Structures are given as structure tokens and as C-alpha cells.
Regions:
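Charged, compositionally biased N-terminal leader segments and the immediate start
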Residues: 1-32
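Heme-based O2/NO sensor domains and their adjacent alpha-helical segments
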Residues: 4, 18-23, 43-157
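Short terminal or interdomain "cap/linker" segment that borders an active site or interface and mediates
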Residues: 2-3, 9, 16, 160-205
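Short, motif-level signal for alpha-helix interfacial/capping segments enriched in acidic residues
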Residues: 36-41
């Protein structure tokens, strides 16, 4: 007999949503241990990955332009000319530091408690237009592309890491894949909710 899943609750209860995703993807404590193992040996990898993905974002004007916007959390000197924007620009260095913190957090987290689920949910929400003054408002296509690229870069780093044995590499790669599908879902959840809200607002007029 099929297990019942409450569709409406998936949209309102983060724990319930995560539990469903975890069961579907078979994301277990073993995967969390594999991610924690990567975190213990991957500080240089995380540092380089952060720079690599921002270099990728600066390769296209459509993604580069997002970093020319003023955001609530950046207090440094803004480079406002896209032609002058580089990895050494203050707003990019700030973002590189932020994503390093994010990667360290999601890889080191040993217990996926409600506070952590709120964290990865909020990371998604601020990229939409639903977080008020905290919103970055990035089109989802760029978020999705970045997750794909980020996962690829991390997996490539794991494959070529000399301090990780082959068995553990396989476990880490599988765990990373599950991790980013879950995180991507926690992003798309907010984008879909925003789309539903917009459609409901139109119907109400």
C-alpha cells in the first residue's frame, strides 16, 4: 500500500517536506557523515570553489549585472561599472566570503534540525522577491545553472583529492548530489510560491 503524503502540508511544513525528500532520495545519516568527512579535509577546496563559481558568474553580463545592485547586507565600496567588476571588487569579495561560509555550514552540519532547515530555506527565499529588503531577486534559471555548476566543480575536486580514498569518494559524490537536489528544492519552493502568489493576486483584481 502506498504511503500517504499530504500535498498541502509539503508547502507549509519544512520538516515534513524534508522528510519526504529524504525518504524519496534515500538521504540518510550516512550521507551527512560523508559530507562531514568532506568538510574536514576540504577547506582549500571550498576556498577555490568559491572563487571559481564567481568567476563563472562574471563571464555573462546577465549574471554579472546582479552584482551591480545595492543590497542591504553589503556596506563596502560598490563598483558600479560592469566593465570594472572583477573578483577583487569589494562586492564580489563579500559574496565569495558569504558562499564560503554557506558551503562550510552545509557540509559541516551534523544534525539537520529545524533551525538548519530554516537556514537553507531562507537562503532560497532571499534569492526571490519574497524577502522584502533582504531580497536579491535573481531569476531562477541562473540559480539552477549555478547549482549544476557548483556541484560539478565540487565533484571534480573530490575525484582529484589525494586525501580521500576511492570508497569514501563515491559516498561523498552521492551525498553531494542528494544535498544539492534538496537545497535546490528549497529554492524552487519559494519561486513556485511566488508564482502562485502572483497568479492569485491577478485573479483577485
Amino acid at each position: 500500500m502506498a504511503e500517504h503524503i499530504d500535498g498541502s502540508r509539503l508547502d507549509t511544513d519544512l520538516r515534513y517536506r524534508f522528510d519526504y525528500l529524504s525518504k524519496f532520495l534515500n538521504f540518510t545519516s550516512d550521507d551527512i557523515i560523508a559530507l562531514n568527512t568532506l568538510a574536514r579535509v576540504a577547506t582549500p577546496l571550498i576556498n577555490s570553489v568559491a572563487e571559481i563559481i564567481y568567476q563563472k558568474l562574471l563571464e555573462y553580463d546577465i549574471t554579472k549585472n546582479y552584482f551591480l545592485r545595492t543590497t542591504h547586507d553589503f556596506k563596502g565600496t560598490m563598483t558600479t561599472d560592469g566593465n570594472q567588476l572583477t573578483l577583487q571588487s569589494e562586492q564580489i569579495l563579500f559574496r565569495i566570503h558569504s558562499i564560503r561560509k554557506y558551503l562550510c555550514r552545509i557540509l559541516r552540519q551534523s544534525t539537520w534540525n529545524d533551525a538548519f532547515l530554516e537556514y537553507i530555506s531562507n537562503v532560497g527565499k532571499i534569492h526571490t522577491n519574497l524577502a522584502g529588503t533582504h531580497s536579491i531577486d535573481v531569476d531562477y534559471i541562473h540559480v539552477n545553472a549555478l547549482f549544476g555548476y557548483l556541484e560539478h566543480v565540487l565533484i571534480d575536486g573530490v575525484i582529484h583529492h589525494d586525501e580521500i580514498d576511492e570508497r569514501r569518494k563515491n559516498e561523498i559524490i552521492i551525498a553531494l548530489n542528494k544535498l544539492f537536489w534538496i537545497q535546490n528544492d528549497f529554492f524552487s519552493m519559494h519561486y513556485l510560491n511566488g508564482s502562485k502568489k502572483g497568479n492569485n493576486d491577478k485573479k483577485a483584481k
